[in-house]
Each structure stands twice: as C-alpha cells, then as structure tokens.
C-alpha cells in the first residue's frame, strides 16, 4: 500500500494478529480494518494461531461489507497460506503484503492494537476467554461508533465509513 492513495471505504482492508494477555495465559486476536475509515470490520479470538480463525474473520467482513479492492497483511503464515490467499483471489481481491519486519506498512491496525491494549486490555485481567470476548467486543463497538480519531478530522470510524457526520443538537 506504500504508493497507493486510499480515498474511499473498501478500497483497502488490513488484517493483523496480536496477543491478548489474560490473568493466566493469553489469546490471539485477529482483526480486519478498513484502511480509509479505520473501521473494525470483523475480529475473532482464538487460543491457537491457525488460519481458520483468520478465515472466519475474513468471511464475516466479506458477508457484511462486500470485497475490498486490496487486502493488506504482513507475511504471517496464516495470511500466506494457500487457503487464505485463495479465499481472497476467489473474490477478485488484490493481495498486498508488507515488507518483512515493516510494521509501519500496516500502521492503522498497529494503532488499533495500541488503543485497544492501553484503553481496555491492560486495565483488566480477563479470567476466561468468554470475558475477554465480551469486553473486547464492547471496546470494538466503542472504537467504531464513539471514539473520535484525530486523523479522521475528529470523526469516528463509522462516521467516516458510512459518510455521516454528527451535528450538534
């Protein structure tokens, strides 16, 4: 995505995986965001870092939002697997992969991880996967619907994605 100007929703999506610490152990979280609006389109938690939970997140995003033009990821084995890349190609999606070790190529999803962890995850000690799923789900709704982004002219991801603005009452 380095030389592409992203100017509309669903032009480019990004995916990444992060660790979610628990009171005992950790879970893996995958999320797909719209590059233009920063909207979290789908996400999944798993206790294993396999391709299936990434495919579930992809299928959910495609079902609700249709295919993007471009899909960006790092070179993780889940995203380079034949099953995952074929799912993208089957929908006519152009695949873009970051350079090795270039987290800056996926800066918006890295920013999501930072916000999620400092505003939610690190403030809690989830005791069960179900608790983590509920609390992270609540945060994702907040992130999309209520959290203003300076880079979006202080609009929320939903306002930017759907082209709406709030008006003072």
What does each model-identified segment do?
Residues 1-169:
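Charged DNA-binding/catalytic regions of mobile-element recombinases
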């Amino acid at each position: 995505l380095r030389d592409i100007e992203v100017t509309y929703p669903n032009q480019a999506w990004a995916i990444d995986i992060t660790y979610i610490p628990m009171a005992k152990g950790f879970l893996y979280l995958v999320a797909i965001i719209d590059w233009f609006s920063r909207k979290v389109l789908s996400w999944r938690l798993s206790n294993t870092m396999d391709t299936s939970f990434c495919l579930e997140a992809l299928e959910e995003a495609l079902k609700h939002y249709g295919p993007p033009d471009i899909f960006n990821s790092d070179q993780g084995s889940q995203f380079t697997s034949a099953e995952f890349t074929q799912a993208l190609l089957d929908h006519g999606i152009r695949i873009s992969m970051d350079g090795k070790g270039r987290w800056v190529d996926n800066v918006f999803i890295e920013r999501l991880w930072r916000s999620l962890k400092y505003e939610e995850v690190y403030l809690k000690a989830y005791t069960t996967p179900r608790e983590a799923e509920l609390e992270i789900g609540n945060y994702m709704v907040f992130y999309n619907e209520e959290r203003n982004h300076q880079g979006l002219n202080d609009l929320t991801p939903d306002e930017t994605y759907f082209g709406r603005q709030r008006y003072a009452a």
